[in-house]
């Protein structure tokens, strides 16, 4: 899959997938909206809280590496050569994730590669390119308006 992600601390994210099909994930820090235009469906869930250790909290700076994770050096298969790899296991077991693997650029410490293994054995891999930091996106970018004519599924978590 291919797309863009914009992250703003604390807890705000917008993931826009453009290929192979469009889908959108938006968090305003309180609620997460997962929009699937082809299915005419929006899933609405509470955003993770400080008690969680999801990849989202890690990326938005809400998780604390030392407090929340046990870290170990790791070679990440498929990651670009030269990245520093860390395997992160939550100190408090997360109901959804086994571990995260992070590939960090040793020059500027940007996260370039992220792998999340869920409790069902599913693996999600993200490769970040063309990173731009300190862009100060407007808060309105993280507001989601539910389109007319879609089914809304609410998850209590």
For the regions a language model picked out, list residue spans one by one.
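Short, solvent-exposed helix-to-loop capping segments enriched in aromatics
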Residues: 51-66
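Glutamate identity and glutamate-enriched acidic tracts
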Residues: 1, 21-24, 62, 96-98, ...
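Gly/Pro-enriched, hydrophobic low-complexity segments
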Residues: 43, 66-157
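An acidic-aromatic
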Residues: 4-55, 124
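A generic structural signal for short beta-strands and their flanking turns/coil linkers
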Residues: 1-3, 9-11, 28-30, 67, ...
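Short secondary-structure boundary/capping segments
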Residues: 4-5, 23-24, 61-63, 75-78
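A conserved hydrophobic position in a structured secondary element of the catalytic/binding core
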Residues: 27, 61, 104
């Amino acid at each position: 899959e291919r797309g863009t992600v914009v992250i703003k601390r604390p807890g705000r994210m917008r993931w826009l997938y453009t290929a192979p099909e469009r889908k959108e994930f938006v968090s305003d820090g309180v609620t997460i909206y997962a929009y699937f235009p082809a299915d005419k469906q929006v899933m609405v869930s509470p955003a993770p809280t400080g008690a969680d250790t999801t990849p989202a909290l890690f990326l938005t700076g809400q998780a604390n590496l030392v407090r929340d994770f046990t870290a170990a050096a790791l070679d990440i298969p498929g990651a670009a050569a030269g990245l520093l790899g860390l395997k992160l296991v939550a100190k408090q077991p997360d109901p959804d994730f086994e571990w995260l693997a992070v590939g960090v650029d040793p020059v500027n410490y940007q996260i370039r590669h992220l792998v999340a293994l869920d409790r069902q054995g599913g693996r999600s891999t993200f490769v970040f390119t063309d990173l731009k930091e300190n862009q100060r996106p407007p808060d309105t970018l993280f507001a989601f308006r539910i389109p007319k004519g879609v089914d809304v599924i609410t998850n209590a978590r």
